[in-house]
Swiss-Prot record:
Gene3D superfamilies assigned: 6.10.140.630
Residue stretches in coiled coil: none
Superkingdom of source: Viruses
Further comment: HIV-1 lineages are divided in three main groups, M (for Major), O (for Outlier), and N (for New, or Non-M, Non-O). The vast majority of strains found worldwide belong to the group M. Group O seems to be endemic to and largely confined to Cameroon and neighboring countries in West Central Africa, where these viruses represent a small minority of HIV-1 strains. The group N is represented by a limited number of isolates from Cameroonian persons. The group M is further subdivided in 9 clades or subtypes (A to D, F to H, J and K).
Protein species of origin: Human immunodeficiency virus type 1 group M subtype B (isolate YU-2)
One of the GO BP terms on file: mRNA transport
Span(s) of short sequence motif Nuclear export signal and binding to XPO1: 73-84
Job of this protein: Escorts unspliced or incompletely spliced viral pre-mRNAs (late transcripts) out of the nucleus of infected cells. These pre-mRNAs carry a recognition sequence called Rev responsive element (RRE) located in the env gene, that is not present in fully spliced viral mRNAs (early transcripts). This function is essential since most viral proteins are translated from unspliced or partially spliced pre-mRNAs which cannot exit the nucleus by the pathway used by fully processed cellular mRNAs. Rev itself is translated from a fully spliced mRNA that readily exits the nucleus.
Species classification: Viruses, Riboviria, Pararnavirae, Artverviricota, Revtraviricetes
Main subcellular location of this protein, as a coarse class: host cell
Protein name in the entry: Protein Rev
Residue numbers covered by motif Nuclear localization signal and RNA-binding (RRE): 34-50
Entry keyword set: AIDS, Host cytoplasm, Host nucleus, Host-virus interaction, Methylation, mRNA transport, Phosphoprotein, RNA-binding, Transport
Post-translational modifications reported in the UniProt record: Asymmetrically arginine dimethylated at one site by host PRMT6. Methylation impairs the RNA-binding activity and export of viral RNA from the nucleus to the cytoplasm.
Length: 116
């Protein structure tokens, strides 16, 4: 699973369950009452969410020895990335489905500001 050397999967699962209980103990505020009452409930809810987020980070870093932020993701070289949308772009969920298209010649992204 996602454990490092020395960490057991049970410790990770127990910590994740605890964090899940913390988030479930703070449901979103109701939309009833006056505008001021709704605003106060949202403000208090956001503050509790911030506290839960910091407690979760503390649990992950101190109890399991993991950073709260994910490990940096290695991106492909810039030459392979394009903004070409000549064909049907579709929705973001369908983009990239099918045969991959890699441009041989990359278009200039930043020009000097003059049009040709």
């Amino acid at each position: 699973m996602a454990g490092r050397s020395g960490d057991s999967d049970e410790d990770l699962l127990r910590t994740v369950r605890l964090i899940k209980v913390l988030y479930q103990s703070n449901p979103p505020p109701s939309s009833e009452g006056t505008r001021q009452a709704r605003r106060n409930r949202r403000r208090r809810w956001r503050e509790r969410q911030r506290q839960i987020r910091s407690i979760s980070g503390w649990l992950l870093s101190n109890y399991l020895g993991r950073p709260t932020e994910p490990v940096p993701f290695q991106l492909p070289p810039l030459e392979r990335l394009t903004l070409d949308c000549n064909e049907d772009c579709g929705t973001s969920g369908t983009q990239g489905v099918g045969s991959p298209q890699i441009l041989v010649e990359s278009p200039p992204v930043l020009d000097s500001g003059t049009k040709e």
